[in-house]
């Protein structure tokens, strides 16, 4: 799930954004 997180901005809260 870290790959998509980088697109969001590399925060690491991909689960929180889950866009």
UniProtKB/Swiss-Prot annotation:
Domain of life per record: Bacteria
Keyword Acyltransferase included in the entry's annotation: no
Entry keyword annotation includes Cell inner membrane: no
Entry GO CC: ribonucleoprotein complex; ribosome
Keywords assigned by UniProt, alphabetized: Ribonucleoprotein, Ribosomal protein, RNA-binding, rRNA-binding
GO MF, one annotated term: rRNA binding
Role this protein plays: Protein S19 forms a complex with S13 that binds strongly to the 16S ribosomal RNA.
UniProt similarity note: Belongs to the universal ribosomal protein uS19 family.
Protein name, entry field: Small ribosomal subunit protein uS19
UniProt gene name: rpsS
């Amino acid at each position: 799930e870290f790959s998509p997180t980088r697109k969001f901005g590399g925060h690491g809260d991909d689960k929180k954004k889950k866009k």
